[in-house]
């Protein structure tokens, strides 16, 4: 960052890495439990959730092209917004008759956005912090990524179970 606009990394490293962990865990683990509770067949769950995880595997294919269009910081902010909106659309699609098709489509958007966020977030971390600062904040990076995993896999699953018990469930 330039000297006149320098922001302490403690203000952005935790949130960036929390935002990296949340979509990955929500799509790879929590969605499986949700679809299973909603009556989707195991074969469909396995196929579609495996497919929507591909963007994280294919990150190296589009990472070189990101800065041709906008900055890494732009992609960090934009992908966080896209991911948030797409999660909202997943939630809104669940009561619909063809919820599975819509939910998978929105989750595909989340996957591409989340993988792009990972690329951009790591890029910002590497370019904005020197080696000493990177070493200083590596613990924060890992802690908040893992906190996202815990809250998503524990807290979100608990919340979903509570809502299912109080509101009911939509069956596929």
Regions of interest found by a model, annotated:
Residues 2-56:
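Helix-loop boundary and gating motifs at the non-cytosolic
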Residues 18, 86, 98-117:
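Hydrophobic core of transmembrane alpha-helices in multi-pass small-molecule transporters
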Residues 18, 50-54, 81, 108, ...:
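Transmembrane alpha-helical cores of Major Facilitator Superfamily
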Residues 31, 114-129:
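Intracellular juxtamembrane helix-capping segments at the cytosolic ends
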Residues 42-43, 129-141:
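Loop-to-transmembrane helix entry/capping segments in MFS-fold secondary transporters
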Residues 55-59, 135-160:
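Glycine-rich segments within core transmembrane alpha-helices of 12-TM secondary carriers
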Residues 64-69, 91-92, 151-172:
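Transmembrane alpha-helix termini and helix-breaking/packing motifs in multi-pass membrane transporters
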Residues 77-99:
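C-terminal ends and interior cores of transmembrane alpha-helices
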């Amino acid at each position: 960052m330039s000297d006149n606009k320098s922001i302490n990394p403690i203000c952005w490293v935790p949130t960036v890495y929390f935002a990296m962990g949340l979509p990955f865990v929500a799509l790879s683990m929590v969605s499986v439990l949700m679809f299973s509770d909603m009556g989707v067949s195991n074969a469909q769950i396995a196929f579609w959730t495996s497919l929507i995880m591909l963007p994280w595997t294919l990150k190296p294919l589009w990472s070189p092209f990101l800065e041709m269009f906008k900055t890494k910081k732009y992609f960090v902010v934009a992908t966080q917004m896209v991911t948030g909106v797409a999660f909202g659309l997943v939630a809104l699609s669940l009561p619909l008759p063809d919820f599975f098709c819509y939910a998978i489509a929105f989750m595909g958007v989340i996957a591409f956005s989340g993988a792009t966020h990972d690329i951009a977030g790591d890029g910002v971390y590497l370019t904005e912090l020197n080696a000493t600062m990177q070493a200083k904040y590596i613990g924060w990076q890992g802690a908040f990524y893992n906190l996202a995993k815990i809250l998503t896999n524990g807290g979100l699953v608990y919340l979903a179970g509570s809502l299912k018990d109080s509101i009911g469930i939509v069956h596929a």
